[in-house]
């Protein structure tokens, strides 16, 4: 394969792998705090990029992104407090179905607010034709932003969970809810915090890839299932593994074009998910024991 | 002739050996009791016998056939029925419907015949209903038959569960702490009931904490401690067994 | 016998509604009512799975699409070029082929719609049997995700395959002649007849499930739903039973898909969309999960309204909101219903009135 094409696939895998990893991390944070899968996770990514896109015309990009992250975080908190908290007694399945309903409503709301059109964000530095060169390969500087911000998210979360009181409290809660509440930690606040964080991280991730991937109202569902695939691949709850799994899946999807027509690209990823669920639901890097040691 | 024959049965969870090389024989038409302090492995043993758990090693012979590791529904089809320590009834179904589930192993109608309401199934349904009513009447709960079990008193729910197990006409009945939660009078009735059931031709294996019940009705007693069988014999022998008394020291039993 | 009432009502409606609507000059509603019936059939299949076996499936639209696409593909497949081959000759001899001409007058040799229909149903059942075993071993969110994944795979395949018409789907699907003179097809002249066919099929489907619920197998399913361990201990082969319901659900969806396609004369990838699966779930949820009559009524009402365009642009959003509302309020709603029912039966005295899952 020609070098240029190879690099193209590589970078595409990197870009999409990063966003899948970010979605997966969001899944994991909520899963660890609540034990449920938030089907609406992809919508947070969509909201972040769409809001930022809508605001970017009227204010500096950094401000638009900051506002988008804040607003999406608020949306995540609202979703948890208004809906999920009420359904929590009904069991895991009810919460899952509720998140499905919520993802639809959020998506339709986005459609009503911003229409069907594809939107994008300005490049963080330079523009769509600027490119850097490394080892003879040309790539957009946005890729550095993506890698950098993903790394920052992972590093930031690691520090948060290890060093801050809130982070440790969340880990305590996910390991042993009752024990944690006996120590004075309010599990419900942890859940709200988890949703807020997942939403905010998702929004940030959405913003940083938007210049290259574009965004529109319906990207949520596809991201959700791929993000879940990545999360499950690395073992639900294990976000460090999610990063590696994300890159792996991103690459797999990108390079699958060699064998499979473009129209079937999604099918490859979904088949990976199905095979994974049937063969080893605890994930490639996971195990029953490891999942009980879930970190963040 | 033994209805149940265990040998070298072992099962671990993580590093913990819940059942460690347990073996004994339960004679046909005996009432065999399995006793032991909490954590001795009694419920795990039951689960190994009924197929809910598969053993790490050892064999389970039921009525002459090797059923080691067989799935519970297959074991049930061979004539073993059980009750559970925590009542496992269908809360939304009536008592009669719950007992009718017990007849599942004695009937054949499948999905297609069910959906088409094939004529021959009507006769079978009638027979299922009649046999279930017999079990219900035996346990004296006929007045509750059309009530949802979720709303019934605890003691009655236990009876429904027992009727369900009986309706399957088992060769061996496993009772998991049947007296738990019952008062003195109810326990007395239960003792009479168990003996009556045995007298109708059902071998009984019972796990129980209530010592008076155990000593009263058992033909054989098996004592477990920390997953091992430490004694077996008739009630009087067990009562005077030094080791058994030792493991129960500090435990308050009737 | 009270449990047969809804099916009987459907059958009656099949014959009574068309003249009634004709008299009130609202016969145009027959089209949407016919389509609604087919969608409800798919929901009924899902109700059996979700309500009685307690398994969620977000892939029902996938089976609907399999039935629809397989049936239409096989009945539009032109075998003229292969007319000489032995297989085609054999099929011709046994009367399993039908002749016609296409839009341009050229000869058209294709599988008889009955054969295509049966093949489509068998295909759906086979696929359900294949994926059901591993899928049903999963629990909770893994099961939801797996069925969602299945639905997405089907949608991507039908949308991306040229041979299945790609984004445009298949059209010119021939009528499906059930009996001489009676065919599932579009067209105003056949409107009343097609309405009757749809509602009779619906009535039969409902009847079969009502029978199932009160049969030995249905009892075992309910026990399975309430506690797999106890059901297994009582001799119920839980894995096989769950699989059987899964297959039944798939077959119902496939039949609905095939018949609807012949009625509409065309099929597109939109029918395999995740949103459609969500609709089926929402309808079952509103109906009360294990409530066949509830699913019937909710399904007919919601589908009819949706097809009439009452929800406008908010069509998808409505179903999403319904899902949320049901999840939030259903427990309380059901409890409310039960306590008022309880008050009623208490007033009647302890006549040992039967309660339990509604059929």
Task: Report residues per predicted region.
Chain A
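Cytosolic-side transmembrane-helix boundaries in multi-pass membrane proteins
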Residues: 82, 113, 118, 175-189, ...
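Short, non-helical or kinked segments that cap or interrupt transmembrane helices
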Residues: 27-49, 89-94, 166-169, 187, ...
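Membrane-interfacial amphipathic/re-entrant helices at transmembrane-helix boundaries
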Residues: 1-22, 51, 59-64, 90-95, ...
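Helix-loop-helix "hairpin" substructures at the membrane interface of multi-pass membrane proteins
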Residues: 16, 138-216, 239-244
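Alpha-helical transmembrane segments within multi-pass membrane transporters and channels
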Residues: 27, 59-102, 109, 244-249, ...
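Membrane-embedded helix boundary and interhelical linker motif in transport proteins
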Residues: 11, 33-78, 82
């Amino acid at each position: 394969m020609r070098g240029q094409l190879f690099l193209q696939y590589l970078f595409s895998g990197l870009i999409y792998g990063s966003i899948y990893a970010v979605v997966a991390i969001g899944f994991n944070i909520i899963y660890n705090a609540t034990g449920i899968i938030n089907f609406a996770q992809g919508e947070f990514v969509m909201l972040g990029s769409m809001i930022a896109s809508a605001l970017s015309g009227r204010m500096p990009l950094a401000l638009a992104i900051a506002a988008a992250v804040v607003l999406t975080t608020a949306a995540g908190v609202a979703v948890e407090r208004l809906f999920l908290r009420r359904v929590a007694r009904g069991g895991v399945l009810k919460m899952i179905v509720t998140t499905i309903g919520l993802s639809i409503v959020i998506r339709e709301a986005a459609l009503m607010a911003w229409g069907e059109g594809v939107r994008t964000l300005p490049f963080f530095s330079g523009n769509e034709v600027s490119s850097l060169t490394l080892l003879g390969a040309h790539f957009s500087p946005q890729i550095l932003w993506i890698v950098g911000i993903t790394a920052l998210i992972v590093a930031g979360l690691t520090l948060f969970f290890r060093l801050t009181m809130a982070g440790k409290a969340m880990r305590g809660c996910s390991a042993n809810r009752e024990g944690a509440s006996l120590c004075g930690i309010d599990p419900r606040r942890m859940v709200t915090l988890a949703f807020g964080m997942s939403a905010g991280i998702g929004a940030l991730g959405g913003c940083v890839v938007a210049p290259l991937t574009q965004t529109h109202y319906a990207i949520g569902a596809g991201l959700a299932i791929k993000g879940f695939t990545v999360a499950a691949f690395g073992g639900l709850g294990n976000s460090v593994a999610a990063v590696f799994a994300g890159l792996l899946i991103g690459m797999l999807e990108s390079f699958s074009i060699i064998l499979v027509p473009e129209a079937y690209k999604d099918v490859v990823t979904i088949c990976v998910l199905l095979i994974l669920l049937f063969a080893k639901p605890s994930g490639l890097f996971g195990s029953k024991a490891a999942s009980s040691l879930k970190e963040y | 002739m033994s209805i149940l024959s265990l040998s070298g049965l072992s099962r671990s969870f993580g590093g913990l050996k819940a059942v460690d090389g347990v073996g004994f024989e339960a004679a046909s038409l005996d009432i065999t009791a399995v006793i032991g302090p909490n954590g001795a492995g009694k419920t795990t043993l039951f689960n190994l016998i009924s197929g809910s758990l598969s053993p790490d090693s050892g064999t389970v012979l039921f009525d002459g056939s090797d059923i080691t590791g067989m799935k519970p529904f297959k074991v049930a089809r061979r004539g073993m029925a059980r009750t559970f320590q925590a009542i496992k009834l269908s809360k939304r179904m009536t008592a009669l419907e719950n007992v009718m589930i017990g007849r599942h192993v004695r009937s054949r109608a499948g999905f297609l015949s069910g959906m088409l309401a094939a004529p021959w199934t009507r006769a079978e349904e009638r027979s299922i209903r009649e046999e279930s009513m017999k079990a219900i009447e035996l346990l004296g709960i006929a007045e509750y038959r059309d009530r949802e079990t979720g709303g019934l008193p605890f003691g009655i729910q236990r009876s429904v569960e027992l009727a369900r197990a009986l309706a399957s006409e088992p060769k061996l009945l496993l009772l998991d702490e049947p007296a738990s939660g019952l008062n003195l009078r109810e326990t007395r009735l239960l003792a009479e009931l168990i003996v009556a059931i045995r007298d109708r031709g059902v071998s009984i294996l019972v796990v129980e904490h209530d010592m008076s019940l155990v000593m009263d009705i058992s033909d054989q007693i098996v004592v477990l401690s920390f997953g091992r069988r430490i004694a077996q014999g008739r009630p009087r022998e067990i009562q005077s067994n030094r080791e058994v008394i030792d493991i129960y020291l500090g435990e308050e039993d009737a | 016998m009270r449990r047969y009432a809804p099916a009987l009502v459907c059958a009656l409606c099949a014959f009574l509604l068309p003249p009634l609507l004709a008299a009130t000059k609202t016969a145009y509603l027959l089209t949407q009512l016919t389509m609604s019936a087919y969608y409800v059939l798919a929901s009924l299949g899902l109700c059996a799975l979700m309500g009685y076996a307690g398994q969620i499936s977000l892939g029902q639209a996938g089976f609907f699409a399999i039935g629809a696409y397989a049936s239409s593909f096989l009945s539009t497949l032109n075998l003229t070029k292969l007319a000489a081959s032995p297989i085609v000759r054999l099929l011709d001899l046994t009367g399993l082929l039908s002749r016609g001409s296409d839009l341009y007058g050229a000869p058209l040799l294709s599988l008889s719609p009955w054969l295509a229909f049966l093949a489509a149903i068998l295909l759906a059942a086979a696929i359900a049997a294949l994926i059901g075993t591993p899928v049903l071993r999963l629990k909770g969110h893994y099961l939801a995700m797996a069925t969602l994944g299945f639905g997405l795979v089907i949608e991507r395949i039908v949308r991306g395959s040229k041979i299945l018409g790609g984004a445009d789907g298949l059209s010119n699907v021939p009528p499906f002649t059930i009996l001489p003179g009676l065919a599932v097809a579009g067209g105003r002249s056949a409107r009343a007849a097609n309405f009757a066919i749809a509602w009779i099929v619906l009535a039969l489907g409902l009847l079969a499930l009502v029978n199932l619920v009160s049969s030995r197998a249905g009892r075992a399913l309910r026990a399975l739903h309430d506690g797999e361990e106890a059901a297994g201990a009582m001799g119920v082969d839980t894995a096989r039973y769950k699989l059987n319901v899964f297959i039944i659900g798939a077959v119902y969806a496939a039949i609905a898909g095939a018949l609807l396609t012949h009625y509409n004369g065309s099929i597109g990838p939109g029918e395999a969309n995740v949103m459609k699966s969500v609709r089926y779930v929402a309808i079952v949820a509103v109906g009360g999960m294990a409530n066949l009559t509830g699913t019937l009524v909710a399904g007919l009402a919601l589908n009819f309204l949706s097809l009439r365009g009452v929800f406008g642009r908010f069509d998808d959003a409505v179903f999403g909101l319904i899902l949320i509302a049901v999840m939030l309020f259903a427990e309380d709603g059901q409890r409310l219903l039960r306590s008022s029912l309880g008050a009623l039966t208490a007033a009647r005295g302890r006549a040992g009135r039967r309660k339990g899952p509604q059929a």
